[in-house]
Regions:
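A substrate-binding/cap region within the structured catalytic cores of diverse enzymes
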Residues: 81-146, 151
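Solvent-exposed loop/turn segments at secondary-structure junctions
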Residues: 4-7, 38-41, 77-80, 107-110, ...
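Glycine-rich, highly charged phosphate/nucleotide-binding loops
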Residues: 47-61
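An N-terminus-focused feature that recognizes amino-terminal "leader" regions
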Residues: 8-28, 40-45
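Conserved small/polar residues in nucleotide/adenosyl-binding loops
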Residues: 204-208
Length: 208
C-alpha cells in the first residue's frame, strides 16, 4: 500500500519495483497493490485509465479470492493520516480472514530513526560530499509530522553533517529551512545544496 504518485516513470522505478521484489520473494502468494490517496487514484484513472485499488478494494479482492492470511505492507514513511486510515480499513476486515497483520510505517519506533539515518547517510554521503543536504518529506497535519524533526536530529547525530528536513504539506517548509541555512553559523547564501526527496521518488540535485 502506497500513497501513490501521478508520475508513471516514478511509479515504475519505485512503487512497482517494491511490488516486484515482494512477488519475487513470495511467488506463491496473492499480491495486491493499493493506493491510499483518493486524489492519486482519481488522477490515475483520468489521465492513464488505470483503476488503482484502494486498500479496502484490495482487501475485498483478496477475500473473494479465498485468501485466509493477509500481511499489509505500507510504504508510508510516517504513521500519519494515510497510515491510520489504512489500519482502520484493516480492522474492519479482521473477521474476514483467519489472520490479518499490518506492518509499521518506516518511522514507528525510536530504533527506526537510527536505522534509517544510517541507511540514508551511507547511501548518500558520496553524492553529498561537503554540500548541505535537504531532504523533502511529504508532511501532514497529523501529530506524526513531528517525526520529520526527530529524523533530522537522528541524521545530524549519525552523519555529523549539515542536514535539514523540510516538508511539502507539513509544519516545516522549504522556506523555513532556507531561513535556517541563511541565519545559521554555516551561512550558505551562495553555493550548492543537495536536495533529495524523503519519499518514494527519484534523487536529484539543485543549486540554491
Amino acid at each position: 500500500v502506497s500513497f501513490g504518485t501521478t508520475y508513471p516513470d516514478t511509479r515504475q522505478k519505485n512503487i512497482a519495483a517494491i511490488t516486484r521484489q515482494v512477488r519475487a520473494l513470495y511467488p506463491d502468494a496473492v499480491v495486491e497493490e493499493a493506493v491510499s490517496s483518493t486524489i492519486v487514484r482519481n488522477a490515475m484513472k483520468k489521465r492513464e485509465h488505470i483503476e488503482a485499488k484502494s486498500p479496502t478494494e484490495a482487501l475485498e479482492s483478496m477475500k473473494k479470492q479465498g485468501v485466509t492470511h493477509v500481511a499489509v505492507f505500507p510504504t508510508h514513511v510516517i504513521d500519519g493520516i494515510e497510515n491510520h486510515r489504512l489500519k482502520e480499513a484493516a480492522k474492519k476486515y479482521a473477521g474476514a480472514f483467519e489472520q490479518i497483520a499490518v506492518a509499521d510505517a518506516l518511522l514507528a519506533k525510536p530504533q527506526d530513526y537510527e536505522d534509517v539515518a544510517k541507511a540514508l547517510w551511507e547511501s548518500l554521503k558520496e553524492e553529498v560530499g561537503d554540500f548541505p543536504l535537504i531532504l523533502m518529506g511529504h508532511g501532514t497535519e497529523h501529530a506524526a509530522d513531528a517525526s520529520y524533526a526527530m529524523m533530522e536530529q537522528s541524521l545530524r547525530a549519525y552523519a555529523k553533517h549539515e542536514i535539514y528536513i523540510a516538508t511539502v504539506e507539513g509544519s516545516i517548509t522549504i522556506k523555513d529551512v532556507i531561513a535556517r541555512m541563511k541565519s545559521g553559523p554555516q551561512s550558505r547564501q551562495n553555493g550548492k545544496v543537495l536536495l533529495t526527496p524523503f519519499m518514494l521518488c527519484l534523487l536529484y540535485t539543485s543549486d540554491a
